[in-house]
Amino acid sequence: MARPWNFSAGPSALPESVLQQAAAEMLDWHGSGMSVMEMSHRGRQFVQICDEAEADLRELMNVPADYAIMFMQGGGLGENAIVPMNLIGRRGLPAADFVVTGHWSTRSHKEAGRYGDAQIAASSAQAVNIDGHEQRPFTWVPPLSDWRVRPEAAYLHLCSNETIGGVEFTEWPDLAAFGAPDVPLVVDASSHFLSRPLDVTRTGLLFAGAQKNAGPAGVTVVIARRDLLGKALSICPSAFDYANVAAEHSRYNTPPTFAIYVAGLVYKWVKAQGGVQGLEAANKAKADLLYGYLDASGFYRNPVHPAVRSRMNVPFVLHDESLNDAFLKGAEAAGLLALKGHKSVGGMRASIYNAMPLAGVQALVDYLKEFERLHG
């Protein structure tokens, strides 16, 4: 029986070959007689798994040696606290700046305020007119000329792909241009991690929950410049102190072993697809197909300004919201799952991450056409 197409925003679809390999190795990993779930996190088998995952990720993202790669717990929401506990006091005055472009950067800003002075450097929380497009709040990105970054800030945080709103940064700023060359950029890249080339060297720290593009829920990837480590607040738990985690190669405490193993399988799958460059081409083709149909239709509408539309998360609304339930019921019957939009914005959302093939997006477009034919 064919599997349905899963458009969940996260946890999301994994490559089928990864699931098959994990299933085949479930009871006996490489002749060890053990499942990965049964291994000691300090035993040689898991050390090999963890180190290989780190090496593959470093290769895929061109991560220099002066950056540490850490596999942690807590998800992106946890990192909203762990980042300030590690970085906000590094320059004495606990202060950090935020670019607020949606739900997740709003939560990051609010959480950091518990640990210091968290100020908004730029925001898209208001409606604007851009090139004749009337844009609702959080459907656009503030131009760099409007950013106000304090030179004394410990870091500047942005969410480079807002999963709920479907807003994506296509490039990251050079903070020297704002007169803040000593302010490192912190990026929440959770929902477009490994979907396109990302220049880690433009950041001081990058984090990503794996459950969207890079594995199952339970492991969070943190990539941090080593010179930023070792300056955690005294209230930071030792297990969340980046200096401790990096020094022990993600094994300071018991890490999420099985999640790291599956993430490692995903990294090998990404390499087999031609790396992030190969996936970028595939993701662009999928996004072009879906946005192309939505834009041509008078029945559906994507609210995001075209210049900052996400390739990963595509929100859309029907012209008649009373049809929402019928749309979702019909979609599920057609084998198209998890298309309901986030409760904070409503409507629909198709998350078309790396593991979603073009055929899945084509199946969605075919359904969109048929539903419009019946109800338009």
Swiss-Prot record:
Disulfide bridge positions per record: none
Cofactor note: Binds 1 pyridoxal phosphate per subunit.
Reaction catalyzed: O-phospho-L-serine + 2-oxoglutarate = 3-phosphooxypyruvate + L-glutamate; 4-(phosphooxy)-L-threonine + 2-oxoglutarate = (R)-3-hydroxy-2-oxo-4-phosphooxybutanoate + L-glutamate
Any one of the GO CC terms: cytoplasm
Binding site for L-glutamate: 42
GO-annotated biological processes: L-serine biosynthetic process; pyridoxine biosynthetic process
Pfam family, one: Aminotran_5
Binding site for pyridoxal 5'-phosphate: 104, 163, 188, 211, 253-254
Keyword Translocase: no
E.C. number(s) listed in UniProt: 2.6.1.52
Enzyme type, top EC level: transferase
GO molecular function: O-phospho-L-serine:2-oxoglutarate aminotransferase activity; pyridoxal phosphate binding
Function: Catalyzes the reversible conversion of 3-phosphohydroxypyruvate to phosphoserine and of 3-hydroxy-2-oxo-4-phosphonooxybutanoate to phosphohydroxythreonine.
Family per record: Belongs to the class-V pyridoxal-phosphate-dependent aminotransferase family. SerC subfamily.
Cross-referenced NCBIfam families: PRK05355.1, serC_1
The protein, known as: Phosphoserine aminotransferase
